């Protein structure tokens, strides 16, 4: 019978065992995925595990498409498992996996990662994410989540992440940090797995919906006193004292809260919410990377006028 003593040893270890020439001990070679660009787009591409199976990212999404089928040699053996000298033999040829062509542009990805790391250092941030997309067809040209990790060494936790986790869990009884939790945090694609409040970028949606629904024109006047009262809340504009008189274009340029709130109110809840649906804000994008988070939009019955 055959017993596997250890798998996934490095070449140096395998060569050392061979030199010992131990009776009955055989070293089999296997293939391992190598990533020539190291950490580039690590959380998008993903990596393979010890058995060359996809673990995260595109590697796991397209695992069955990429991995192919191993070949086999079938031979006849005696009761002791010894191959018979003149026994029949049947060979099953291996089938190579498929190639996968994706929309990422390496130069754009590298440049975006460079900018992200500069921002990470300048702002002393914990992480920075960037997406570069073709607005006409949704193709992703770059998806950055820094700090990225080395795809050729994916099971070594980032030291900064390790230190942060130790500080966060200092109150725990045993003060230990699970290795898998650290790795999951390091591998997390925040562009896909997390949700964010869009903030003032959502004003583009409000303005476009207002124009589409015909409740506002480019020349419509607005007045910004610096705030607007909604129910029991006073929602302020970012400019103290307000922007004063402004038209639609200027209000959008100024990112004026009261003016954009007025546009939303003119549409009413039902029409405004329908625009959310029409723009695809209530559904997933369907990107072919595992773990896309759902919407954080409120339900229709939870929105007031």
Regions found by a protein language model. Name each.
Residues 1-97:
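Small/polar-residue-rich segments within soluble enzyme cores
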Residues 2, 85-128:
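Conserved, well-ordered alpha-helix/loop/beta-strand core segments that scaffold catalytic motifs
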Residues 14, 18, 41-45, 55, ...:
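Extracytoplasmic/secreted envelope proteins and their assembly/folding machinery
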Residues 23-27, 121-135:
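Short N-terminal helix-loop-first-beta-strand/juxtamembrane motif that initiates sensory/input modules
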Residues 35-38, 93-94, 123-124, 134-135, ...:
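Extracellular/periplasmic catalytic domains that process cell-envelope and extracellular macromolecules
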Residues 70, 124-127, 196:
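Short, small/polar residue-rich loop motifs at catalytic or cofactor-binding pockets
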Residues 78-88, 104, 136-201, 205-305:
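Beta-lactam-recognizing serine transpeptidase/beta-lactamase-like catalytic domain environment
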Residues 112, 130-141:
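Short, glycine-anchored, charge-dense loop/turn motifs used at functional sites
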């Amino acid at each position: 019978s055959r017993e596997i003593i250890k798998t996934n040893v490095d070449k140096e270890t395998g060569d050392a065992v061979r030199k010992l020439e131990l009776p009955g001990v055989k070293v089999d070679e296997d293939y391992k995925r190598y990533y020539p660009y190291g950490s580039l787009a690590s959380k998008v591409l993903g990596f393979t595990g010890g058995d060359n199976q996809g673990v995260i990212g595109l590697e796991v999404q397209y695992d069955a498409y990429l991995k192919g089928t191993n070949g086999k040699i079938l031979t006849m053996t005696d009761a002791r498992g010894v191959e018979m000298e003149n026994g029949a033999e049947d060979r099953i040829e291996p089938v190579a996996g498929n190639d996968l062509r994706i929309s990422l542009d390496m130069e754009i990805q590298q440049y975006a990662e460079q900018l992200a790391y500069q921002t990470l250092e300048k702002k002393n941030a914990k992480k920075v994410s960037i997406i570069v997309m073709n607005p006409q067809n949704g193709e992703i040209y770059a998806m950055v989540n820094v700090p990225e990790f080395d795809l050729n060494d994916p099971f070594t936790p980032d030291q900064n992440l390790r230190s942060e986790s130790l500080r966060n869990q200092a109150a725990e009884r045993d003060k230990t940090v699970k290795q898998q939790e650290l790795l999951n945090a390091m591998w997390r694609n925040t562009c896909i797995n997390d949700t964010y409040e869009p903030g003032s970028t959502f004003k583009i949606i409000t303005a476009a919906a207002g124009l589409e629904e015909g409740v506002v024109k480019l020349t419509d006047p607005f007045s910004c006193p610096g705030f607007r009262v909604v129910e029991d809340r006073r929602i302020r504009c970012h400019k103290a004292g307000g922007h004063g008189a402004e038209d639609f274009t200027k209000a959008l340029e100024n990112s004026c809260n009261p003016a954009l709130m007025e546009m939303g109110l003119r549409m009413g809840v039902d029409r405004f919410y329908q625009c959310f649906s029409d723009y695809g804000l209530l559904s997933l994008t369907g990107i072919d990377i595992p773990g896309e988070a759902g919407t954080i939009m409120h339900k229709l019955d939870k929105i007031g006028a």
